[in-house]
Regions:
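Class I S-adenosyl-L-methionine-dependent methyltransferase catalytic core
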Residues: 1-123
């Protein structure tokens, strides 16, 4: 059973980003009409080799709602727009910057993406 109390906290927000990560696709990372979801809540700071030189990089993932995009905790038809930008990487090192920044697809990635699309259409 889904948590229907979450619908009370939507406050007119009609955009749902189900895989927000560090919100890199957003110009306004605190858009007032959006709710940001992710399965992670973490801050990563480290030195990763770049094409120019070694540099310190920071990745901050702080979603409004911590959840899995394959099982969203919102009632059906709650949003007008759902943003779905899932991980694209299948093979990447455990500590690689790209993995920290964008996540990684698991072995069941086909089923995961299928279920994610289904949930995005539902909400």
């Amino acid at each position: 059973m889904r948590d229907t109390n979450l619908v009370n906290g939507l406050d007119g927000k009609k955009i749902l980003d189900v895989t927000c990560g560090s919100r890199t696709i957003w110009f306004d990372k605190q858009h007032p009409a959006a709710i940001y979801c992710d399965v992670r809540d973490e801050e990563c700071v480290g030195v990763w080799k770049s094409t120019n030189r070694d540099s310190e990089r920071t990745c901050i993932v702080h979603p409004d709602v911590l959840c899995d995009f394959t099982d969203l905790p919102f009632p059906s038809n709650s949003f007008s727009l759902v943003v779905f930008d899932p991980p694209h990487l299948r093979r990447v090192g455990e500590n690689a910057w790209m993995r920290k920044k964008y996540g990684q697809l698991g072995g069941n990635w086909r089923e995961m993406l299928h279920d994610g699309f289904r949930e995005g259409m539902r909400v």
